[in-house]
């Protein structure tokens, strides 16, 4: 059987180990070819090929349900559930999503994108099953990185108190999340992994007995119960934490040995209560470049399979916002020992790996624990430090209560630096940074700012570190504009003060962050049609520069706002609230992301679909304020 013939995972039933190994080879081949062409997560999926095949051979997927944590390791799952022939559309607009979506396939039982949710979801399904008198298996597959998240531990704590609830947790332990794992739990799991001498001892004894002339086979057969007893004794000791929490612990199992995996899963299915099977895997298995550099090959842009190197850009690009952030913060930290960078398992993605290498004592990785990261920062701020929490916009959502309760109510000087703010592209709705302006703007004592380019990002970093209270800066994914970057001597910005970039009499355009340059381009297009616009770089969404904005709005009488975020509660809402508070009844056109989920596509495709290109925005402005001539029509 070829992988291309598999449309249902139950087709794996009855296949030999040799046949499964052949399909595993085909999965890796398709996985590598596709990600090399489209980009996507590479290492996670390569590491769970055998785990997926063995698990699915022992389940009835017409009835049983598997929940994959995060979902970026579920590419083999997608290939085994009828998506082989359109797998080339992975992460492309209108194609297969990079994560799991309930609307995409009937075997995607729970959508995700953020970590540590799988055990809670699978336990919920198990309890629903029992409440309705049904009988099927519920399985959560979770990585050791995700297991550091508090929600996963909360779910384990709950499940362990339900001895009659049948639940299987498969711990995919590759000693990595995106970067190497941190913390006591990770250290404990690593001790379990290195306890493999027990496995080696029993296997060695078996091989030795087989070589005894005449009686070796019989002795070996008789030794099997002893061998299993030795293993169980070892397991009960090394898995003590999980046993004490109410789980039957099995493992560690070689995650690339199909025979051992199948036997272990079949044994696990016999238990009636919660079971944890500990599977030791290698991230990036089967592709040497990914095995050697597990951080770099966690996820990749399109690359050359033969060399493992990214396909060269057509022309040199400016440094990314993340890199500018990391380099600038490191320079500032060298002269200010109060500065400490905090990440929740995203050092490389946020640029904090630069600080980690240069000043390791001023760097903290808390693991996948956003709530802890925020309160840790609050505690450090209480005692004179200047913590900088570097985090993706989408992940700060997970610590919303802590931002309010532990930082803002106490007005502590914690600096939130929100990478990937706005449209992020192929990762889709779970990763879009759409909501931070709205959900942070409503919190008293919080200051919000966003740079128009990478040079202003440097100045805002100085501003945030100097400010004596809660403050947040958002900046987008990807490369900067390409403006000159001074290496030192950055000046802070006055809090709540905007910048006028262009003078005009017909229209007031107020832009925030990454939308400043598109607003300037829009103004140029409007100017060609006889409309002159004043363009303001707001810099701050809270507090607004009302001393500048309100008189201009009163004078010009027509206002357009620009933001790369959700319109409900966002920057445009802040402007309209301000004008209303000053009794100004002027027409306002807010431009941004409407009340919808932005699906996976390239950032440019998403902006086109949302009407956020300069030409589209100019057309909307002309339509709003009475002109019948459209920019697009005029340029056609």
Swiss-Prot record:
User: Which protein are we looking at?
Assistant: 1-deoxy-D-xylulose-5-phosphate synthase
Please provide the record's keywords in A-Z order: Isoprene biosynthesis, Magnesium, Metal-binding, Thiamine biosynthesis, Thiamine pyrophosphate, Transferase
What gene is this protein a product of?
Answer: dxs
Q: Name one GO cellular component term.
A: cytosol
Q: Which residues cross the membrane?
A: none
Cofactors, names only? Mg(2+); thiamine diphosphate
NCBIfam families according to UniProt: dxs (TIGR00204), PRK05444.2-2 (NF003933)
Per UniProt, the cofactor note for this protein states:
Binds 1 Mg(2+) ion per subunit. Binds 1 thiamine pyrophosphate per subunit.
Task: Identify the domain of life.
Answer: Bacteria
Asked whether the UniProt record includes Magnesium among its keywords, one would answer yes
Instruction: Report the sequence similarity comment from the record.
Output: Belongs to the transketolase family. DXPS subfamily.
Q: How does it assemble?
A: Homodimer.
Q: Which GO terms describe its biological process?
A: 1-deoxy-D-xylulose 5-phosphate biosynthetic process; isopentenyl diphosphate biosynthetic process, methylerythritol 4-phosphate pathway; terpenoid biosynthetic process; thiamine biosynthetic process
Residues recorded as binding thiamine diphosphate, renumbered to this chain, are: 72, 113-115, 145-146, 174, 287, 370
Q: In which pathway does it act?
A: Metabolic intermediate biosynthesis; 1-deoxy-D-xylulose 5-phosphate biosynthesis; 1-deoxy-D-xylulose 5-phosphate from D-glyceraldehyde 3-phosphate and pyruvate: step 1/1
UniProt-listed InterPro entries: Dxylulose-5-P_synthase (IPR005477), THDP-binding (IPR029061), Transketo_C/PFOR_II (IPR009014), Transketolase-like_Pyr-bd (IPR005475), Transketolase_BS (IPR020826), Transketolase_C (IPR033248), Transketolase_CS (IPR049557)
């Amino acid at each position: 059987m070829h992988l291309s013939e598999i449309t249902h995972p139950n087709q794996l039933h009855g296949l030999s180990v040799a046949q499964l190994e052949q399909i595993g080879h085909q999965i890796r081949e398709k996985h590598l070819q596709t990600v090399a062409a489209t980009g996507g997560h590479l290492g996670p999926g390569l590491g769970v090929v055998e785990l997926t095949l063995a698990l699915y051979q022992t389940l009835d997927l017409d009835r049983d349900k598997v929940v994959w944590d995060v979902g970026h390791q579920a590419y083999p799952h997608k290939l085994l559930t009828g998506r082989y022939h359109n797998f080339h559309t992975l992460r492309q607009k209108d194609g297969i999503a990079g994560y799991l979506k309930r609307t995409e396939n009937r075997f995607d039982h729970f959508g995700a994108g953020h970590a540590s949710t799988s055990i809670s979801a699978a336990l919920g399904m198990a309890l629903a099953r029992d409440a309705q008198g049904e009988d099927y298996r519920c399985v959560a597959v979770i990585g050791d990185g995700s297991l550091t998240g508090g929600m996963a531990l909360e779910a384990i704590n709950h499940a362990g108190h339900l001895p009659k609830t049948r639940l299987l947790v498969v711990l995919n332990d590759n000693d990595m999340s995106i970067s190497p794992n941190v913390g006591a739990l990770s250290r404990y799991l690593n001790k379990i992994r290195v306890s493999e001498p027990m496995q080696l001892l029993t296997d060695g004894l078996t091989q030795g007995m087989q070589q005894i002339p005449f009686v070796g086979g019989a002795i070996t057969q008789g030794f099997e119960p002893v061998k299993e007893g030795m293993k169980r004794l070892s397991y009960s000791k090394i898995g003590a934490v999980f046993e004490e929490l109410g789980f039957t612990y099995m493992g560690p199992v070689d995650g690339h040995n199909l025979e051992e995996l199948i036997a272990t899963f079949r044994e696990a299915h016999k238990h009636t209560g919660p079971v944890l099977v500990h599977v030791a895997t290698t991230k990036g298995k089967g592709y040497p470049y990914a095995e050697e550099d597990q951080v770099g090959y966690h996820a990749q842009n399109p690359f050359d399979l033969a060399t493992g190197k990214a396909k060269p850009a057509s022309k040199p690009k400016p440094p990314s916002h993340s890199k500018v952030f990391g380099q600038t913060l490191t320079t500032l930290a060298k002269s200010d020992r109060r500065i400490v960078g905090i990440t929740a398992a995203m050092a490389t993605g946020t640029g904090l790996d630069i600080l980690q290498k240069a000043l390791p004592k001023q760097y903290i990785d808390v693991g996948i624990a956003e709530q802890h990261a925020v309160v840790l920062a609050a505690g450090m701020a209480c005692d004179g430090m200047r913590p900088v929490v570097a985090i993706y916009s989408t992940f700060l959502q997970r610590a919303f209560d802590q931002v309010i309760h532990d930082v803002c109510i106490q007005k502590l000087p914690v600096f939130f630096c929100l990478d990937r703010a706005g449209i992020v592209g192929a990762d889709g709705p779970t990763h879009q940074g759409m909501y931070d302006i709205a959900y942070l703007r409503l919190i008293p004592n919080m200051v919000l700012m966003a740079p128009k380019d990478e040079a202003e990002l440097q100045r805002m970093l100085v501003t945030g570190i100097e400010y004596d209270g809660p403050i947040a800066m958002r900046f987008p994914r990807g490369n900067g504009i390409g403006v000159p970057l001074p290496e030192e001597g950055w000046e802070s910005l006055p809090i709540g003060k905007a910048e006028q970039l262009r003078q005009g009499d017909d229209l007031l355009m107020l832009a925030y962050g990454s939308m400043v340059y598109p607003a300037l381009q829009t103004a140029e297009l409007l100017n060609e049609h006889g409309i002159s616009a004043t363009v303001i770089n707001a810099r701050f969404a809270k507090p607004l520069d009302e001393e500048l904005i309100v008189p201009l709005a009163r004078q010009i009488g027509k206002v357009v706002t620009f933001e790369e975020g959700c319109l409900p509660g966002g920057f445009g809402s802040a402007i309209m609230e301000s004008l209303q508070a000053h009794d100004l009844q002027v027409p306002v056109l807010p431009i941004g992301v409407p009340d919808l989920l932005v699906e996976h596509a390239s950032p440019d495709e998403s902006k086109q679909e949302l009407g956020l290109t300069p030409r589209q925005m100019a057309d909307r402005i002309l339509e709003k304020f009475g002109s019948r001539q459209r920019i697009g029509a005029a340029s056609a």
